[in-house]
Regions:
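Short acidic-glycine-tyrosine-enriched beta hairpin
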Residues: 71-85
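Conserved short histidine dyad/triad with adjacent acidic residue
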Residues: 36-51
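Short beta-strand His + acidic residue motifs that chelate non-heme Fe in jelly-roll/DSBH
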Residues: 47-48, 66-67, 83, 89-95
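Glycine- and acidic-residue-biased ligand/ion/polar-headgroup-sensing regions
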Residues: 54-55, 59-64
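A short hydrophobic beta-strand segment most commonly corresponding to one strand
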Residues: 38, 82, 97-113
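A short, N-terminal "cap"/entry segment at the start of jelly-roll beta-barrel domains
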Residues: 1-32, 116-124
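A generic "binding-loop/recognition-motif" signal
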Residues: 52, 71, 87-88, 97, ...
Length: 124
């Protein structure tokens, strides 16, 4: 059994966003899924980007504005958002509280993609 502790996972911080790499090829040898816990401070913005993989965001706390391929929606705790592969997506925390969510992607990003997504501030 593999149990991943947030405080022991690789971390990446950028622009009011902290990401914790939980399940991945590099952390547990995952072959089909990557999961990340993301904490976004008020005013934080995940800039528009896209991946070849499918993703979903499961909002744990807070709220924000999600945009996928030009369509915007307010999302909050309890919501799960599906992001099709190659969709341009972003998330903006317009609230006054921290937005926390789990990002799950499949198939797995792979080591090369992990390093591209988790560049300079990589910590473990």
């Amino acid at each position: 059994m593999k149990i991943i502790k947030k405080e022991n996972s690789p971390q990446y911080a950028r622009d009011n966003i902290r990401s914790f790499l939980l399940v991945a090829e590099s952390t547990v040898g995952a072959k089909h899924i990557t999961t990340t816990l993301v904490e976004m401070d008020p005013g934080g913005i995940q800039k528009p980007h896209q991946h070849e993989i499918e993703q979903c965001y499961m909002i744990l706390e807070g709220s924000g504005v999600m945009e996928i391929d030009g369509e915007k929606a307010v999302v909050g705790a309890g919501d799960t958002i599906f992001i099709p592969s190659d969709s341009i997506h972003s998330l903006h925390n317009e609230s006054h509280t921290t937005l926390k969510y789990i990002s799950a992607g499949s198939p797995v990003f792979g080591m090369k993609n992990e390093r591209e997504l988790w560049p300079l501030n990589w910590q473990s």
